């Protein structure tokens, strides 16, 4: 019985911590003069707490595993909600596709530049000497 209670406690603790970060993010979003979704701020709060090791990762792992396991199911309501605006999406299909393509390219360039900035130029494995 003690093992079962321990497992239940781990799941409850994980979800309480995840939701505490979410609601802290929602609260901070309501105070900020710019529009940033509270869920994004909550994720950043959780990331900072984990990165600074203020919050041990083992405390949130059980809840994260459950959320990741059922992630596809969690997108179903969002897909149904988007279908309510099908006519609007069909009318704006071109601009949506163009903005998605451009933003994807911008992300590729920024990640590539950041990676080169952080890691510097390294010799590729199997590559002979480079001419400079």
UniProtKB/Swiss-Prot annotation:
NCBIfam families from the UniProt entry: PRK01821.1
Residue ranges annotated as Cytoplasmic topological domain: 28-30, 84-92
Any one annotated GO CC term: plasma membrane
Keywords noted in UniProt: Cell inner membrane, Cell membrane, Membrane, Transmembrane, Transmembrane helix
InterPro entries documented for this protein: LrgA/CidA, Uncharacterised_UPF0299
Transmembrane regions: 7-27, 31-51, 63-83, 93-113
Periplasmic side: 1-6, 52-62, 114-132
This protein's encoding gene: yohJ
Localization terms from the record: Cell inner membrane
Highest taxon in the source lineage: Bacteria
Keyword Cell membrane: yes
Name under which the protein is recorded: UPF0299 membrane protein YohJ
Signal peptide coordinates: none
Organism: Salmonella typhimurium (strain LT2 / SGSC1412 / ATCC 700720)
Protein family membership: Belongs to the UPF0299 family.
Major site of localization recorded for this protein: membrane
Membrane topology field: Multi-pass membrane protein
């Amino acid at each position: 019985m003690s093992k079962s209670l321990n497992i239940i406690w781990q799941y409850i603790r994980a979800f309480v911590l995840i939701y505490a970060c979410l609601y802290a993010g929602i609260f901070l979003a309501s105070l900020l003069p710019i529009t940033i979704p509270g869920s994004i701020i909550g994720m950043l709060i959780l990331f900072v707490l984990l990165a600074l090791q203020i919050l041990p990762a083992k405390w949130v792992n059980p809840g994260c595993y459950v959320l990741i396991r059922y992630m596809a199911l969690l997108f179903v309501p969002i897909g149904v909600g988007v279908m309510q605006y099908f006519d609007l999406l069909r009318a704006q299909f071109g601009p949506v596709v163009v903005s998605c393509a451009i933003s994807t390219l911008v992300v590729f360039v920024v990640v590539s530049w950041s990676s080169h900035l952080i890691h510097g130029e390294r010799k590729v494995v199997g590559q002979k000497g480079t001419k400079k």
